């Protein structure tokens, strides 16, 4: 009786059906799950085209997306590798297969080896083959044909363990890997090949024979005859891998397909045998589909796992060394390693040296299905001029969360300006054992974002003054128009910005030659009133001599002079736009909306009118990408944007927050806990915190889960009647000796800040930032007052001296607070009047009785209302050293009238800002300035900066 046919076609069909069902099942709870196989074919070989069609058809049946990339025969190796690299980096591509053979001019090994092992679903890359050949190896994928052979044997209930197997053929594609698989399943394996003498002698006692020698009917049927010549006790299972075409005049094609085994004879003597075609071939394709599914599931599972961010150990010293000494004593992680720990792909990362990099905002799109992590705002009580340690607390908190409690956490902070760094303020990287490293790179230039803001701002300023010059010196409309819209190669064309201006003016024309004289005048003349220009040039250095200058004094400017001045770069509205934009499109639209002046008819003139929107966006294209750095304990920090806290929101960017919240977020069905994003707002909560909620949260659509309010014994003593604290002078003894009475009186300021936070419906944790001279009695007084005022918790934190270890209790309190319900609401309705919004902030946040709007401020308010800008949120610029407008009023002043001296528009950023006093928007340098101590040694190490 003849043996039986082992039908690979039917088995493959069952596998494809099972794969399709499993995909549908997963999609039931993960709708976005879509296994994707990329197939690269170079050239037009008919056999390759046939195999590709088979794979695409099988993918369709299995519910797998097949992305077919067909390259011309002449494609260079560089081009093919570029496609492979793109697919390697594409998170939507789970498997990659390069159809072989490739044209002769291409190196197959180099190209196939370029495929990432995690996407090498063919299983033949060096990593997967290498792991397969190790005794305890762990390949990502088994090669498809050998895997299909094993599955066929299992399907036929063939016992592999303890069997004797003979493999005829030693190729890297089938022979060698199938031998390894059989061996790993405890079969005793003999490998033979075309040069082996008397192959038939090896087959008599074989239980399993795999033939992959590539020669038509090389193995004769009679080789399987039992030694005694009978046909009894047939036990051999034959797997024929061969695919050979031999002449057959009876076929229409003139050829027929045969295997490496003489099928018609062998079936007489064996138990099972695979046919050709219809045996191993369909199983190979089915295993390709199964490997693709495995890859997609593995990626899904990896994305659902909590982030693992191994900490860097700290060697704590007493007394605590200087910040720069601590920074240099710690060897940071390579930034690409930290990015990998965060789940950032290499194509989403742009390295700037070893320890800083930019992150593509496209991370947000890739992780769009994730639920955001927990969002924590760090703010403070009304500070002394020495500061109370918000940045240090931010770093200590994330170090505690990640390095000591195993919770993924990212700190999001502003980029410091060079001006204060080289002036009197020093760096802004935190301090002690809670800081960003390398701190010199953090404080100097970083990746050049501030310089990009400066270039963009100054281009705009130059464009405004130059436009006024050209309009004034060219009186004839037609002549001016011809120069504004010149002919190139005999044709005139509006730029995109010009076309947008035409549309806003209601001129629905696209051909420059079609405009009437009236339309030409309306379009070409901006008629800027020079007295209304709000844009100043900027520089990122403290330079008091630039506060007021006269431009246009060169003879070439024909007496077109104008008094103007410089701002520090971070005071530019473009910096606020960078901080508040949700994405590149939003940034471009905001830039276009910036009002630079009014025309002679009091109508607003925008960046879009000047024609600068595209150019400014181009200059800021890279600046919109957040910068990745790390803390002393190797936890991630995103550094992005640095709007001037005096007249702007004083917070890092919306984009950085959105990126970070997705990176530490969780997939909808994941059972892991979300991580934490800890950001901060400038000055005290009454200023930075209020702006954060009413301006930044309106722009981002995000709301914090908790607020950390930083308080110090020193600051509360200042508000409780202790002598003033002055920078550069020794602290009065009241601050270094126990004085609980001062603390208890000053605690009223903290309690007012707690009440202010609670008006937004968010839980608040008070962080008592510990100093060496603080006593237990003073700290206990603060905690008691905080809890009585409604704080969720009040915790002492010693992160400056101990790093994350010193902030563990604070981190635990923040975790608990962030799990409390939030009843968030804004302080005011943006659609209420400007006057009402100002009054609400002054009364509810500052404790004032009323506002006093000076005539010039009222004139501007009326103008902004007339121009349609009355429904914007409000930013109030005032002193940071008092809840009121008067820095000498400590504690919790009440009943005062708050002056509004001026109101200005930041339409691109999306707010009005009112000034309670004259604010210097470019600082000066002191007699002794920070830059005087800076030196650089022969190795490039910077000394004296901090």
UniProtKB/Swiss-Prot annotation:
Q: Where is this region: Formyltetrahydrofolate synthetase?
A: 320-946
**UniProt main location, coarse:** cytoplasm
Q: Which residues carry this modification: Phosphoserine?
A: 176, 322
Question: Which residues does NADP(+) bind?
Answer: 169-171, 194
Catalyzed reactions = (6R)-5,10-methylene-5,6,7,8-tetrahydrofolate + NADP(+) = (6R)-5,10-methenyltetrahydrofolate + NADPH; (6R)-5,10-methenyltetrahydrofolate + H2O = (6R)-10-formyltetrahydrofolate + H(+); (6S)-5,6,7,8-tetrahydrofolate + formate + ATP = (6R)-10-formyltetrahydrofolate + ADP + phosphate
* Amino acids binding substrate: 51-55, 98-100, 277-281
Result after altering residue 144 to S: Cyclohydrolase activity is reduced 20-fold. Dehydrogenase Km is increased 7-fold
Which positions bear Phosphothreonine? 318
Q: Gene3D superfamilies this protein is in?
A: Formyltetrahydrofolate synthetase, domain 3 (3.10.410.10), Leucine Dehydrogenase, chain A, domain 1 (3.40.50.10860), NAD(P)-binding Rossmann-like Domain (3.40.50.720), P-loop containing nucleotide triphosphate hydrolases (3.40.50.300)
Q: Which GO terms describe its molecular function?
A: ATP binding; formate-tetrahydrofolate ligase activity; methenyltetrahydrofolate cyclohydrolase activity; methylenetetrahydrofolate dehydrogenase (NADP+) activity
The task this protein performs is described as: Cytoplasmic isozyme of C-1-tetrahydrofolate synthase. The trifunctional enzyme catalyzes the interconversion of the one-carbon derivatives of tetrahydrofolate (THF) between different oxidation states by the enzymatic activities 10-formyltetrahydrofolate synthetase, 5,lO-methenyltetrahydrofolate cyclohydrolase, and 5,lO-methylenetetrahydrofolate dehydrogenase. Involved in the generation of one-carbon intermediates in the biosynthesis of the purine bases.
Complex formation: Homodimer.
Q: What else is known?
A: Present with 35600 molecules/cell in log phase SD medium.
User: What does the UniProt entry state concerning the protein's domains?
Assistant: This trifunctional enzyme consists of two major domains: an N-terminal part containing the methylene-THF dehydrogenase and cyclohydrolase activities and a larger C-terminal part containing formyl-THF synthetase activity.
Q: What is this protein called?
A: C-1-tetrahydrofolate synthase, cytoplasmic
Specify the species.
Answer: Saccharomyces cerevisiae (strain ATCC 204508 / S288c)
